[in-house]
Amino acid sequence: MDQAGDAQARDAVEQCDAVVIGGGPGGSTAAALLARRGYKVVALEKDHHPRFHIGESLLPMNLPVFERLGVLEKVRAMGVFKAGADFEADNERGYNTYAFDRAIGNSPPHAFQVWRQDFDKMLYEHARECGADAREGHEVKRVEQAGPRESLLDVSTDRGESYRLRARYVVDASGRDAFFASRKKLRRKNPAHQSAAIFGHFRGARTREGEDAGNISIYNFDYGWMWMIPLPDGVMSVGAVARPEYLKQRKSSPREFLLQTLQQVPALWQRLQQAELIDDEVRVTGNYSYDASAMGGPGWILVGDAFAFLDPVFSSGVYLAMSGAEKAVEVVDRALRDPACEMTLMRKLEKRQRAAMKRFAFFIYRFNGPVMQKMFRQPRNIWQLEQGVISMLAGDLFDMPLVLRKLRLFKLVYAVYTLRDWRRARRERKYRLAQARLQFSGGTTPLDPA
């Protein structure tokens, strides 16, 4: 091509109805559903699938989303059956099982654990099958407003090419990159909670017995909590989420530090006696709890981690991203047909998402505190409080009045217990807020800033 042809190619602007930034669960969901509604959708993922991602444990409330999306059987085929979540307890077994089939809401009685690289790839390919133009190795570099709602996007490929897109709407599902929130200076560090994680994958770890074999197991230690997540092919995801102070003191290699950390919980370490760390590979990441001060504006909307990220303890990330993407598609669809209703719908959705995150946050912020630990280690189902917690663990936090009433009652009981030991609770809160002011910068994953 001659120079004139090159210039013409650069100046050409490709037209579409919607651009979706990011090829994770939220982005793939949005792209698939918008394409199904007849819109011309371009989905842009800067990497290539399959690519590694943490967050392997799904919630029961994911299942209705999978069914509406048309991928439930694909998830079932690739996942490990998850009947519940196990937490340490002062009983003969050493743990309590919060079985999902005891939930009081309408949540399904089980979930799945998946390899995220396979799960994310399947969802992205499904978006393509639904009609989205799903591109990989294409990174959005800049977005500028081209009208009241339209946007112009500058895109670069990993082959060294560049082009422009004009979109009537942009869905930002860029994950922790938080493309729009970062560039529009909307991103806010969470002043109440920060943590960091270190983890690896083991082969040969001991699972629970019987129906509990596929459960996620949660353990506590002095600086945070640990997980064990059974994955396909006999692999166990094992890691620790800790206050930044703990990870910042690491002087040994990531492998040595992980093993030293896991040994602090004998019940977990015992399950790893016959296990082998796969490829001796250990990853470290900061969780960087944050949110955006606004979910969207004229012609753009944030989905999933591009809007907010809390903490992985209750495995809520994939569900909040995909369910949020479903609702975001409704906003985009209505806004493209009737722009006058856009901001009203967006404010309603933002209020809904923030309310669910606030309900999760109540448990997350206090999870390592003495009162919450006592309530999880010695659960009592008076007034169906334990079943209300199970519904929360299942992700049923939006539209079930009975569940929300039980969670409000749980908070009241928590307050009573806290008053009994208010000095200790105050010390824990003071420590948590001090940790939230720290910044951990030792991450080794692509999600962590260099």
What are these regions (language model features)?
Residues E330-A450:
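C-terminal helical "tail/cap" subdomain of flavin- and related membrane-associated enzymes
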Residues R51-E92:
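N-terminal FAD cofactor-binding segment of flavoenzymes
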Residues H126-L268:
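Predominantly flavin-linked oxidoreductase catalytic cores and closely associated redox partners
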Residues I104-E125, K248-S253:
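Short beta-strand to alpha-helix junction loop
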Residues G27-S28:
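N-terminal Rossmann-fold NAD(P) dinucleotide-binding loop
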Residues M78, Y246-V331, R337, C341-R347:
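FAD/FMN-dependent oxidoreductases across multiple families
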